[in-house]
Amino acid sequence: MVEEMLAARGICVSYETVRRWANKFGRTFSDQIRRRAPARGDKWHLDEVVVSIAGETYWLWRAVDQYGFVLDVLVQKRRDRRAAQRLLTKLLKSAVKPPRVMITDKLKSYAAARREMKLHVEHRQHKGLNNRAENSHQPTRRRERIMKRFKSRRQAQCFLSTHDQVANLFHIPYSEHTTANARRALRERAFGMWSDISKGNLAA
């Protein structure tokens, strides 16, 4: 994300340089973006995908709202009820209110976690309904190939949490009613916020 933004301005940097920047400033930037973000949608798409970390298999759990904004990510060793419950607990702590609808694939862990937590949320389980969450994993796959796989679980969690918040900032939900001028204004607002955050942290 950052290297693409710089490339648009004719500045070329290596992935290693971006990685060092992310390690130094990433958490601070992502926390500030999250605090400034508006309330997200009330329809949560939850999904999990396999990632390889230092030769071991982990599960990357991700939640996305109906507009394509990533709500949160969690790298875990398992794919059971407790893992699903950890993700839901993390989501509920940062949410303004519980979701209206929760959409997942047919993995039984989600329903078990919902019952255990006594969540009164409509739960829809259908493979075809969850394409939004599945599509959100695609940038992770591309990054894995570039970075030659993550070196540790902590590195993966830190990188993905940071990357998804930055991606959220520049994400413009598709709508046939959004004009080109409106999209341009949203993009300029995102760059303005990024400029404010980066200048503030670099000056500190």
Predicted regions and their residues:
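Active-site beta-loop-alpha junctions of metal-dependent nucleic acid enzymes
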Residues: R20, K24, V73-A95
